Swiss-Prot record:
GO CC annotation terms, alphabetical: cytoplasm; nucleoid
Function of the protein: Negatively regulates its own expression and that of the subsequent genes in the proximal part of the division and cell wall (dcw) gene cluster. Acts by binding directly to DNA. May also regulate the expression of genes outside the dcw cluster.
Subunit structure: Forms oligomers.
Coiled coil: none
The keyword Transcription regulation is annotated on this UniProt entry: yes
Family: Belongs to the MraZ family.
SUPFAM superfamilies assigned: AbrB/MazE/MraZ-like (SSF89447)
Single GO biological process annotation from the record: negative regulation of DNA-templated transcription initiation
Keyword terms, alphabetized: Cytoplasm, DNA-binding, Repeat, Repressor, Transcription, Transcription regulation
UniProt key word Cytoplasm: yes
UniProt subcellular location: Cytoplasm, Nucleoid
Protein name (record): Transcriptional regulator MraZ
Length: 152
């Protein structure tokens, strides 16, 4: 399980160094193989250990290519999916097209989200956190049954 937000830097080649606390788990669970794709709702990237990504691919394969909405989701997620192999120094090369989608330059936030990571431009991340907190403080929606059972 991945959790927490960590500031990391992209080098001039577009590589990020995976924090040490995640490396062993990524090597054990995925032999360092990561799949990176775009988030279709936010300007960030999603990084999945390969076994987790394969579950997503299976779900995507069950969608109908004849349904325009389902086809669009397949196209966006699969069309942007890029395999990244963690090197011996614990670095991942993020493809230029993916960096461009998320507006990644130098300082980025690696955010653990259970079975995957989100990768955000640092400034965009803090803006999103502020928007999320503001939305929660002024929320008028009723919590779903699952959220009502969540006690923090």
């Amino acid at each position: 399980m991945f959790r927490g937000a960590t500031l990391v830097n992209l080098d001039s080649k577009g590589r990020l160094t995976v924090p040490t606390r995640y490396r062993e788990q990524l090597i054990e669970s995925a032999t360092g193989q990561i799949v990176c794709t775009i988030d279709i709702h936010h300007p960030c990237l999603l990084l999945y250990p390969l076994p987790e990504w394969e579950i997503i691919e299976q779900k995507l394969s069950r969608l109908s290519s004849m349904n325009p909405v389902e086809r669009r989701v397949q196209r966006l997620l699969l069309g942007h999916a890029s395999e990244c192999q963690m090197d011996g120094a614990g670095r991942l090369l993020i493809a230029p097209v993916l960096r461009q989608h998320a507006g990644l330059t130098k300082e980025v936030m690696l955010v653990g989200q259970f079975n995957k990571f989100e990768l955000w431009d640092e400034t965009t991340w803090y803006q999103q956190v502020k928007e999320d907190i503001d939305a929660e403080q002024s929320a008028t929606e009723t919590l779903s049954e699952r959220l009502q059972d969540l006690s923090l």
